[in-house]
Swiss-Prot record:
The gene is CHO1. This is CDP-diacylglycerol--serine O-phosphatidyltransferase. The chain crosses the membrane at residues 82-102, 163-183, 210-230, 248-268. Its main location: membrane. It is a multi-pass membrane protein. NCBIfam families: pssA. GO terms for molecular function: CDP-diacylglycerol-serine O-phosphatidyltransferase activity. The lineage of its organism: Eukaryota, Fungi, Dikarya, Ascomycota, Saccharomycotina. Thermally inactivated at temperatures above 30 degrees Celsius. It comes from Saccharomyces cerevisiae (strain ATCC 204508 / S288c) (Baker's yeast). Pfam families: CDP-OH_P_transf. It catalyses: a CDP-1,2-diacyl-sn-glycerol + L-serine = a 1,2-diacyl-sn-glycero-3-phospho-L-serine + CMP + H(+). Pathway: Phospholipid metabolism; phosphatidylethanolamine biosynthesis; phosphatidylethanolamine from CDP-diacylglycerol: step 1/2. Its EC number is 2.7.8.8.
Length: 276
C-alpha cells in the first residue's frame, strides 16, 4: 500500500495538566515561555546566558515519530543534534575528571588532580554552550533535557565528590557525606525535570523568576575551594581543621560538612534564589 503524506501528518491531542512536556534542549539555568498553541512549552525563552529571548518551537509529532521509528544501526546517534553532542562533551569532561582523580590516587602526582579541576571547568563551558548552539541553529532536541541533567550529575555531582575523596576525605563518615551530596544533586535534577513548567514565569520575558534550591553548577565553588587547597598543599594530613575523633569509628574531617550544607541547599524548596 502506498503511504500518503497524510499518514505522517502531525496529530493534535487534547492538553491536560498532567501532560508530559515535549523534551526540549534546556537546563536548569534557563527559563521558558508557555506556547499557548497546543499547551506545549517553547524551549529557552530567556536566561542569563541566552543570546536573545525568542523561544524556539518544540519538536513536533513528525520529529517524535521519526526518532522512535528509525530502527537502523546507530539511528539514535544520527538523530541527535549538534547541541546534544556538546552536552555529551560536558559528560565526557566530568568522566575524564573522575579518571584523573583515580590516576592521582594511584600515582600521587598532583598534576592529575589539577587536571580533574580543569575538566570540571571545561564541562561548565560545554553546559553553557549547548543551549546557545541550539538557539543559533534554531533546532530543538528531543533528548536535550535528559542529556543535560545526566551530564550535570556527572560533571557537577560525581566529579567534585571524586576530587574530595582523592585529596583526603576518605573516612567512612566523609564518604557518607559525599554520597549524600551526590544523591542530593541527583534528586535536585530530577525535581527540576518534573517541576520546571510549574515555576512562576516573568510575564514579559517568560523566564523563570527564581532558582528553587541551589543550581547544580554552583558546586563549582567547592571545586575552586579544593583547587586552592591542592595549590597550597592543604590535602591529606594537612586538610584545614584536621580530623575529628581520629582513630575512632565516627572520625571525620569537619570541613566535609560544607558538602553536606551544599547538598541540603540543592534539595531545598524554601531556598529561592532570584534570577538576574
Amino acid at each position: 500500500m502506498v503511504e500518503s503524506d497524510e499518514d505522517f501528518a502531525p496529530q493534535e491531542f487534547p492538553h491536560t495538566d498532567t501532560d508530559v512536556i515535549v523534551n526540549e534542549h534546556r537546563d536548569e539555568n534557563d527559563g521558558y515561555a508557555s506556547d499557548e498553541v497546543g499547551g506545549t512549552l517553547s524551549r529557552r525563552a530567556s536566561s542569563i546566558f541566552s543570546i536573545n529571548t525568542t523561544p524556539l518551537a518544540p519538536p513536533n509529532a513528525t520529529d517524535i515519530q521519526k526518532f522512535t521509528s528509525d530502527e537502523h544501526h546507530f539511528s539514535m546517534m544520527r538523530n541527535l543534534h549538534m547541541a546534544d553532542y556538546i552536552t555529551m562533551l560536558n559528560g565526557f569532561s566530568g568522566f575524564y575528571s573522575i579518571v584523573s582523580c583515580l590516576r592521582f590516587t594511584l600515582t600521587g602526582k598532583p598534576h592529575y588532580v589539577q587536571r580533574a579541576h580543569f575538566f570540571i571547568l571545561l564541562g561548565m563551558c560545554f553546559d553553557f554552550l549547548d543551549g546557545r548552539v541550539a538557539r543559533l541553529r534554531n533546532r530543538s532536541s528531543l533528548m536535550g533535557q535528559e542529556l543535560d541533567s545526566l551530564a550535570d550529575l556527572v560533571s557537577f555531582g560525581v566529579a567534585p565528590a571524586a576530587i574530595a575523596f582523592a585529596i583526603g576525605f576518605q573516612t567512612t563518615f566523609d564518604v557518607m557525606i559525599l554520597s549524600f551530596f551526590v544523591l542530593c544533586g541527583l534528586a535536585r535534577l530530577a525535581r527540576f525535570n518534573v517541576t520546571v513548567a510549574q515555576l512562576p514565569k516573568d510575564s514579559s520575558t517568560g523566564k523563570s523568576k527564581y532558582f528553587e534550591g541551589l543550581p547544580m553548577p554552583t558546586t563549582l565553588a567547592l571545586v575552586l575551594g579544593m583547587a586552592y587547597c591542592v595549590r597550597k598543599g592543604l590535602i591529606f594530613d594537612n586538610i584545614p581543621f584536621g580530623i575529628f575523633r581520629e582513630d575512632q569509628i565516627l572520625e571525620f574531617h569537619p570541613i566535609i560538612l560544607v558538602f553536606f550544607i551544599h547538598g541540603c541547599g540543592m534539595i531545598s524548596k524554601s531556598l529561592k534564589i532570584p534570577k538576574p
